[in-house]
Amino acid sequence: MKVYISQLTETENIIDLLEKYEIGLEIVLFASPYCLDRQDEFIENYKIELGDLYGKINLGIHGPYADLIPGARDELITKATNYRMQQAYDVAKKMDANFVVYHNGYYPKTYSYIEWMQRTPTYWNDFKEGKEDDDIKIHIENVHEEDYFLLNELMEEIHDEKTSVCLDVGHVNAYSKVDVMEWMKILKKYIKHMHIHNNFGDRDSHLGINKGELDIIEILNIVKDKDITVTLEITNVDELRESLDILYKNGFIKLREVVKNNV
């Protein structure tokens, strides 16, 4: 298991954490259409902000999601979705990122299960064309799904080792009718990335790992010896620091060599 943190604040607020721990960074900036359209400028800014860490830490990209619908009825919406998602993939290539996370985009109150599955597998299979030789993994994330059936069937239809599930445990707790342990049991062969944050089941709060009703340590113990990446998606920087300290004390992450040598 390799641990990343999500950049939900300015780089200067988390740079010391990246320097202290052996963790990677999942960049959220390119979820913004504005940044995607100016990606070369923002990539150069990132190189400056990360300094000596750039090229030394593992990177992932969180792709765009607002207004994007892979299973859209309207072909124009599908084209816009593909355009933005391809832009994020291009960023991942330019930054030598290991993966891109995309939202599944399913809204239970808007689309029927059958309707969504008629179009979405085709979308993802088409999206993968021409990318066979790339090392970038594609992780499809649950958000508003009420159960795991749709993602399970989607993975069965895609048949690609580089395309997998990003299980967001906070989203499961906030939106699903099914316990997160059941999600993990059913989707275990497809889960290659996870978003880790906590809440009390009433909203998608993105709290620290010890601030909600999920037992995050129990969840991580299930996957700690697997070939999987996990990203802490915690909004409050102090809660992120506390969460990383907990992971360190429980043996999930290590100090960087430069830190250990200076202790």
Regions found by a protein language model. Give the residues of each.
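Active-site acidic/histidine proton-transfer and metal-coordination neighborhood
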Residues: P70-S164, V258
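Charged helix-capping and loop-helix junction motifs
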Residues: Q39-Y46, I77-M85, I114-W124, N152, ...
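Hydrophobic faces of well-ordered beta-strands that scaffold small-molecule active sites
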Residues: V3-Q7, I23-I27, L59-H62, V100-Y102, ...
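Active-site beta-loop-alpha junctions enriched in small/polar residues
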Residues: S6-E10, V28-S32, P64-A66, G105-Y107, ...
